[in-house]
């Protein structure tokens, strides 16, 4: 038995699980979402595919959620409602619809699909995926530096004992 899909409401953020990342869209009614799709997107590759790293432009598209999600799982995820006050749903939808067809700047780190939908819903452009990736890189760099320092100190100690 298949799991029931969530029933989004106007202006809801939709998180679509892709392999290794999430694609984001905003629900605008009648089964449709508005989302930012990199211009390099290949049909069937999924929005914000790995190829999105190669482009600096994206198109705002209005498509059926079922088409954008394909076989991937999705969920309503208004994750910042406790931090930011969402704009009225009619305003979110109006703003999203007005952008359909426009080409916008795109960057994985500063202007991606998550930034886009958060700006529409909250008026705040942010991406937790980017923040998480930067934190992970920072922690990894810190661990590498610490390991290097320990290695240097151990080598120095060994030389001094000889």
UniProtKB/Swiss-Prot annotation:
Domain LRAT residues, every copy = 13-129
With respect to pH, the record says: Optimum pH is 8.
Q: List the disulfide bonds.
A: none
Pfam families hit by this protein = LRAT (PF04970)
* Lumenal face of the membrane: 155-162
- In the UniProt entry, which residues are flagged as the active site? 23, 35, 113 (acyl-thioester intermediate)
Question: For this chain's UniProt record, which GO biological process terms are given?
Answer: lipid catabolic process; N-acylphosphatidylethanolamine metabolic process; phosphatidylethanolamine acyl-chain remodeling
Known InterPro entries for this protein?
H-rev107_PLA/AT, LRAT_dom
Q: What is the effect of changing residue 113 to S?
A: Loss of N-acyltransferase activity
* Topological domains, Cytoplasmic: 1-133
- What Gene Ontology cellular-component terms does the record carry? cytoplasm; cytosol; membrane
Q: Does the keyword Lipid metabolism apply?
A: yes
Catalytic activities? a 1,2-diacyl-sn-glycero-3-phosphocholine + H2O = a 1-acyl-sn-glycero-3-phosphocholine + a fatty acid + H(+); a 1,2-diacyl-sn-glycero-3-phosphocholine + H2O = a 2-acyl-sn-glycero-3-phosphocholine + a fatty acid + H(+); a 1,2-diacyl-sn-glycero-3-phosphoethanolamine + a 1,2-diacyl-sn-glycero-3-phosphocholine = an N-acyl-1,2-diacyl-sn-glycero-3-phosphoethanolamine + a 1-acyl-sn-glycero-3-phosphocholine + H(+); a 1,2-diacyl-sn-glycero-3-phosphoethanolamine + a 1,2-diacyl-sn-glycero-3-phosphocholine = an N-acyl-1,2-diacyl-sn-glycero-3-phosphoethanolamine + a 2-acyl-sn-glycero-3-phosphocholine + H(+)
Annotated GO MF terms: acyltransferase activity; N-acyltransferase activity; phospholipase A1 activity; phospholipase A2 activity
- Tissue spec. comment: Expressed in liver, kidney, small intestine testis and colon. Undetectable in testis, placenta, salivary gland and fetal brain.
The record gives the membrane topology as:
Single-pass membrane protein
The text of the family note is: Belongs to the H-rev107 family.
In terms of PANTHER family, this protein maps to: HRAS-LIKE SUPPRESSOR - RELATED, PHOSPHOLIPASE A AND ACYLTRANSFERASE 2
Q: What is this protein called?
A: Phospholipase A and acyltransferase 2
Q: Which organism is it from?
A: Homo sapiens
The uppermost taxa in this organism's lineage are: Eukaryota, Metazoa, Chordata, Craniata, Vertebrata
Encoding gene, per UniProt annotation: PLAAT2
């Amino acid at each position: 038995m298949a799991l029931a899909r969530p029933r989004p409401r106007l202006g809801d953020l939709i998180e679509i699980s892709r392999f290794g990342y999430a694609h984001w869209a905003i629900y605008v009614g009648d089964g449709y979402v508005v989302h930012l799709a990199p211009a390099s997107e290949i049909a069937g590759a999924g929005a914000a595919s790995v190829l999105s790293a190669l482009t600096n432009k994206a198109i705002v598209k209005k498509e059926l959620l079922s088409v954008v999600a394909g076989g991937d799982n999705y969920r309503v995820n208004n994750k910042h409602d406790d931090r930011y006050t969402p704009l009225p749903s009619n305003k979110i939808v109006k703003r999203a619809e007005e952008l359909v067809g426009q080409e916008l700047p795109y960057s994985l780190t500063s202007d991606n699909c998550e930034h886009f939908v958060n700006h529409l819903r909250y008026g705040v452009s942010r991406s937790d995926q980017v923040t998480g990736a930067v934190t992970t890189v920072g922690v990894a760099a810190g661990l590498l530096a610490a390991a290097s320092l320990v290695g240097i100190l151990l080598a120095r100690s060994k030389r001094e004992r000889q």
